[in-house]
Amino acid sequence: MSDLDGFCQNAFSDLNSLNQQVFKANYAVRGALAILADEIQDDLLENPSSYPFSEIVYANIGNPQQMGQSPITFVRQVLSLCQYPTLLDHAEEKWFQNLFPTDVVQRSKMLLKESGSLGAYSASQGIPLVRRHVADFIRARDGFDCEPSDIYLTSGASHAARLIMTLIIARPTDGVMVPAPQYPLYGAQIDLMSGSMVSYSLSEENNWDIDFDQFKKSFDEASKKGINVRLCVVINPGNPTGACISENSMEKVLRFAKAKGIVLLADEVYQNNIYQNKFHSFRRKLGELREKEPDNHWDQVSLISVNSVSKGQFGECGQRGGYLDVVNIPEPAKDQILKLATIDICPPVAGQLLVDMLVNPPKPGDPSYDLFIKEVDEIHEALRLQCRQLYEGTKRMKRVSCLEPHGAMYLHPSVSLPEKLITTAKAQKIQPDEFYAIELLKRSGICVVPGSGFGQPEGDYHIRITFLAKGTEYIERFVKAHNEIMDLYE
């Protein structure tokens, strides 16, 4: 008998032999509730009368086009020609001219010339022309210099954050400060990298701004435990809170980072989802401080900012386009960021073209400008209205309080859960807010994310719900089901 006739169990036969950091990592936005929602949706297809609703409302994730947001015409016209350039052979025909304005044709030809083809690899750092346009956009937005060499195109903001955290987290005692409540991507990535998460609280009493005294306390306590805080994540506008960080808090964080040698990672993907005031980037605030205090070592503050085509008025989540830009990063370290990008080969080229259209949209006088502005304004106003409608709905819900968000796509209401519900949940070894969310899903078909998935303190109960769904019917379902749950357990 040959020694190759038998078999030996492989790595997947013993779960304990696999990377335990993967088992530890948790991404609540697409966790157990989302899986249950999919199962219920499948049940509804087979038996439409099995639940007191006809479809699931996926209010657990910021996925605008899934919830009915229309794509921007200019964006899809350019992508159409780039995906199927043979159409350009018909540019002189009437039907073509009715479908594709001249600036769409010009942009498509320019992008095809730069990329070669959407099916071809690009440079790992991204298409040079697109990076130049990103630098121009940042320069115009903030009023301070930005170079194309500081721009790295990515397959979304999540990829951008992962690149930076992969490079910075080198050992288990390397700490990353993350806001609480936090977007769970960061906690999951820290777990995967075997790093240490250091939570700092946002103040619900102060519109979810940074509680700076607690921020410093979190750093000090981590340091006493031997954790070397190397990176701090700031999310502006906030996810899940929808709040904007005040300029005063921005300055405090930048000064603290300078004093303690901490790299800042600014997640600014919701910069076009602001419903009050205007967006102020961390990059701009750093530039203002450097201009105001030229001899105060501001060139020692390393800042990475990320943006994406998934949010804002584009809502192109599935296309996977984004970028990171770096400030005050030494060239040898930038080389290592590029090395990590090279390992991934390149971001999706279609996503890179979307980034170009995000930062370099039609301008006044261009044939596509009027329609582009009309669509962008309509989407922005629709989101503002949907935000207001859902916020007003929370006022009719028992044991709920909610701050009106200033940005992003979410409400983060506080729910004072009845003691009977908490006891029932704990008896079933389920987090109380998750138990509530399951009850809500089964009664209303609305899928939300329990606050425990965002790192909320023990005994503090919230949910995150998007306001991307159109109309008010789902709000009535939400209010009715919530109040039924409260009545049942009070």
UniProtKB/Swiss-Prot annotation:
Alanine aminotransferase involved in both alanine biosynthesis and utilization. Belongs to the class-I pyridoxal-phosphate-dependent aminotransferase family. Alanine aminotransferase subfamily. It comes from Schizosaccharomyces pombe (strain 972 / ATCC 24843) (Fission yeast). Its cofactor is pyridoxal 5'-phosphate. PANTHER family: ALANINE AMINOTRANSFERASE (PTHR11751), ALANINE TRANSAMINASE (PTHR11751:SF29). Keywords: Aminotransferase, Cytoplasm, Mitochondrion, Pyridoxal phosphate, Transferase. GO terms for cellular component: mitochondrion; nucleus. The gene is alt1. It comes from the Eukaryota. InterPro entries: ALAT1/2-like, Aminotransferase_I/II_large, PyrdxlP-dep_Trfase, PyrdxlP-dep_Trfase_major, PyrdxlP-dep_Trfase_small. Pyridoxal 5'-phosphate binds at A157, S158, Y183, N239, S308, R320. Its EC number is 2.6.1.2. It catalyses: L-alanine + 2-oxoglutarate = pyruvate + L-glutamate. The modification N6-(pyridoxal phosphate)lysine is found at K311. Homodimer. One of its GO terms (molecular function) is L-alanine:2-oxoglutarate aminotransferase activity. It is found in: Cytoplasm; Mitochondrion. One of its GO terms (biological process) is biosynthetic process. Pathway: Amino-acid degradation; L-alanine degradation via transaminase pathway; pyruvate from L-alanine: step 1/1. This is Putative alanine aminotransferase.
